[in-house]
Swiss-Prot record:
Together with its co-chaperonin GroES, plays an essential role in assisting protein folding. The GroEL-GroES system forms a nano-cage that allows encapsulation of the non-native substrate proteins and provides a physical environment optimized to promote and accelerate protein folding. SUPFAM superfamilies: GroEL equatorial domain-like. GO terms for cellular component: cytoplasm. This is Chaperonin GroEL. Disulfide bonds: none annotated. GO terms for biological process: protein refolding.
């Protein structure tokens, strides 16, 4: 039963990460999978599941606060292009995303669709 719960948890983590951030699902899935695996191993060795849960919650709070403290605002078109280029693994795509964001503004919506037409 724990394995099924773990699989559902990992699936939910990936979905929520995609919904909230649109990126990072692989990292979130790997982290969730490791948490489930090590959690099950510790429970099997006699650890208290509620104690593990509390420890994980404290760790999440610490990691979240550390990440938020080190986060930097991405404001300029150049910063957007650099960040998007790193995320996409292609600076040309980063430049296109920055250009699109420049046109629609911070509250605008950009929809990207796959095309079968080369070059478009």
């Amino acid at each position: 039963p724990y394995e099924k719960i773990g699989a559902e948890l990992v699936k939910e983590v990936a979905k929520k990460t995609d919904d909230v951030a649109g990126d990072g699902t692989t990292t979130a899935t790997v982290l969730a999978q490791a948490l489930v695996r090590e959690g099950l191993r510790n429970v099997a060795a006699g650890a208290n599941p509620l104690g593990l849960k509390r420890g994980i919650e404290k760790a999440v709070e610490k990691v979240s606060s550390t990440l938020l403290a080190s986060a930097k605002e991405v404001e300029t078109k150049e910063q957007i292009a650099a960040t998007a280029g790193i995320s996409a693994g292609d600076q040309t795509i980063g430049d296109l995303i920055a250009e699109a964001m420049d046109k629609v503004g911070n509250e605008g919506v950009i929809t990207v669709e796959e095309s079968n037409t080369f070059g478009l």
